[in-house]
Each structure stands twice: as structure tokens, then as C-alpha cells.
Amino acid sequence: MNITLSDADRELVREAERATANAHAPYSNFHVGAAARLRSGKILYGSNFESEVYPAGLCAERSLMFYAQANYADDPIETMAIASNPSERECYPCGQCRQVMVDVERRQGSPMRVLMSGHGTVTAVDSASKLLPFTFIL
């Protein structure tokens, strides 16, 4: 749903937009940035990285979440913002990223808000599970 953002959320979207500058996307030229606010208030960043060995690349969202889980596992991700450059439309996470977002929510025991921005608009969900209602469970 398209919403009015708080100052903190607007800043997180701006941080995600800035993170697109660190993306390595020589093949698609689609630069994606992500920024996450942890419960402690710390902000983490991720950007996509493409490889000549195509499946070896990594999306911005998973790059950020894997870093967060490896280094801040006890500090839950409260909100993640996603942005792209070019920004012709809102940037929605791929299926793999949606699955990992739900996995992270389960691991941390709390929902992760997701802000998907682009072209001057933002759509937000209050839990990543809303992006993947029929999630894989082993």
C-alpha cells in the first residue's frame, strides 16, 4: 500500500537510493540498493553484484540480510528499504529475496517492514511474509 512515510522511513529510502551507487551491474545496468534499520537504530547497506558466472551474482536485499545475520544476528531488522537506478517504477524483491526475508523474520522472531521505492512513490508492507504468502517450509 502506498503510504505517507515518517522522517525515519524517508531517510531509510534515501539511504537505499544512495546504496545503488555501490552496485556492480555491468550486464543489466540495473543498480539496486537496500538499507535496513536494526532495532538498535544502526543502519546497514547492501547493493547488487553481478558476475560473469550469472548465477553467482547476488541481489542487494540478500547481500544486506546475509551480512546482518552474520554480524548482527541479535539485533533484528525492523525495516528494509529497497531502491533502484534507473528508477522507472517501484523496486520489488525477487522470489529468492522474498523467501530469505521470511526466513529472517522467522529467525529473529519479529516482522520486517519492507519499503519498496521508485519513481517518487513508496509501497510498504508491515511484514515480509505479505510479499510471499505461500512461503516454502522444509
Region roles according to the model:
Residues H31-L38:
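Short beta-strand scaffold segments in enzyme catalytic cores
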Residues M1-N22, D75-L138:
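C-terminal binding/interaction regions
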Residues A25-S28:
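Short loop/turn motifs at secondary-structure junctions and domain boundaries
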Residues L38-S40, G118-H119:
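Short acidic-glycine loop/turn motifs at beta-strand connectors
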Residues C59, S63, Q96-Q99:
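Short amphipathic alpha-helical face segments that pack within enzyme cores
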Residues S40-S51, P76-M80:
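Glycine/charged-rich beta-loop-alpha catalytic/anionic-binding loops adjacent to active sites
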Residues N48-R62:
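Compact, glycine-rich, soluble single-domain proteins
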